[in-house]
C-alpha cells in the first residue's frame, strides 16, 4: 500500500493539465463504488471481530513508509482499505458493540454528511454561508422543543445554541464565558483563584476543559459520591466544599452537573444543585451528553427537571440520535457572554450583516474559526425520521437493556450493582456472596478479557465506589434482541469456563 520510493525530487511531476482532482464523472463512478462498499460493510459487519485483533505498530508492515509519488488506481486503494484498514478497526457500528456509549449512525445522517462534504462551506460567519448558519439555528431550536427546554435557551426566546464537536469543546467554551463574568462582577484579578466543581463521576473531559481554560488542577474539586445516592452528587457536600473555598479566599466559578454519567448513568439532582449555584453566583452547566437524548421521550423528561435554572446545557446527538460523530449541541441562556469571551473581529472578516448585529456569527460561539455545515445531518435525521421514530429508537434500546438486566438477575452467579435507568447495565460475576473483593475483581477482569478475546462481543468495565464492574451498553444502530441474547450466552459461557478453572 503506497510507494516506498522517497526520492520525490528526482523525477519530473506529471503534466498539470492531466490532473483534475474533482472531475464530476470520475467522482460519480467512485462514489457508486464507495456506496456499494459501505453498504456491503454494514451488511457483513457481524463477520468481523468487534474488537480489533491487530498488535500495536501493525502499520509498519502494511501501510508503507512514504506517500506514493505517482497516483494509484482507486480500485487498488479500496482493496487496501479492505486488506489493511478494516483489520485495524474496532467496529463501533457492530451490533455486538456493547462497550462505550455508542456513536450512532443512520442513512439520513449519512446523506446529510455527504451534502455537508459536497458543499464544503466554511461557515465562520453568517455571510460565509447564510444557509449553514440559519439551518443550525433552526435545528438547535427544533431539538430544544423536542426536549421541552424553556424559551430562555432558544433563539425563539432569549437564548440560543450552537453545534460544537464534542462535550469537551462545549464545556471549554462555557468555562471561558464564565471567567470574564467573574472578573467583572467579583473583581477577580487572576484566574488562579478560580475554583470549579464536579463529582468523582463527572466525565474526564471536564478536567481537560478546565485545564485548557486555565484553571489550576489543584482548583478542580471532585465531590465524592456513594452508592447510597446511586453515585449522584450531594448538594450538601458541594455546598460545604464551596464554603471552605470561600473561607480560604478562593472564588467559586463553575459547577458541572451530569445527567447520565459514563460509568453508571447516575443523575445529579439539578434543582438542588441550582439552589447552590444561585446562592453563590456561579455558572451552572449540565452535561447530558448521552442520556439527554432520552429526554425527548416523555417518560424520561423528568430527569431534566430543573434545567430551566441552569446557565448552559450540552447534549450529543451523535451518541443516541442517529447523527454521526461529531455533533454536540450547546445551549446557553446568555449568548452575549459566550460571544464576548470568544469573539474576534479582524478587518478581513468585517461585513455589513455582522456589523449590524442582526445575524449570528458562529465563529464567536466556539474555539476555532472555521466550521462545517453539520446542521445538515441533524436536519436530515429529524425530517427523515420524525420525533416519533427517534423516540421509538431510544425506547427499543432501553427495552433491550432491560431484557439483558433480566438475564443477569435470573442467574444467581451474577448481580446488578447499580439500578438501570437507560440502556446501560452495570453488573459483575459474584458466585459466592461475601467473597474476597480482590478475588472477585480478578475473576471479573478475566471474564471481560475472555469475552472480548473471542471477537464476538466487546464490553468495557468501570470501577465505582471501589467496586470493579462490567458495563453492557446497548445502543449500536444495528443491535437487535438476538444480539443481546447471544451476548448473554457468551458471557455465561465465559463464566462457566472460568469457574471450572477455579
From Swiss-Prot:
Alphabetical list of InterPro entries matching this protein: Aromatic_deC (IPR010977), PyrdxlP-dep_de-COase (IPR002129), PyrdxlP-dep_Trfase (IPR015424), PyrdxlP-dep_Trfase_major (IPR015421), PyrdxlP-dep_Trfase_small (IPR015422), Pyridoxal-P_BS (IPR021115)
EC number from the UniProt entry: 4.1.1.105
SUPFAM superfamilies (UniProt xref): PLP-dependent transferases
Reaction equation(s) it catalyzes: L-tryptophan + H(+) = tryptamine + CO2
Modified residues (N6-(pyridoxal phosphate)lysine): 319
Region Disordered: start-end pairs: 1-21
Compositionally biased spans, kind Polar residues: 1-18
Entry coiled-coil feature ranges: none
Pfam families noted in UniProt: Pyridoxal_deC (PF00282)
PROSITE patterns associated with the record: DDC_GAD_HDC_YDC (PS00392)
GO terms, molecular function: L-tryptophan decarboxylase activity; pyridoxal phosphate binding
GO biological process, alphabetically ordered: amino acid metabolic process; carboxylic acid metabolic process; indole alkaloid biosynthetic process
Protein name: Tryptophan decarboxylase TDC1
Species this protein is from: Camptotheca acuminata (Happy tree)
Lineage: Eukaryota, Viridiplantae, Streptophyta, Embryophyta, Tracheophyta
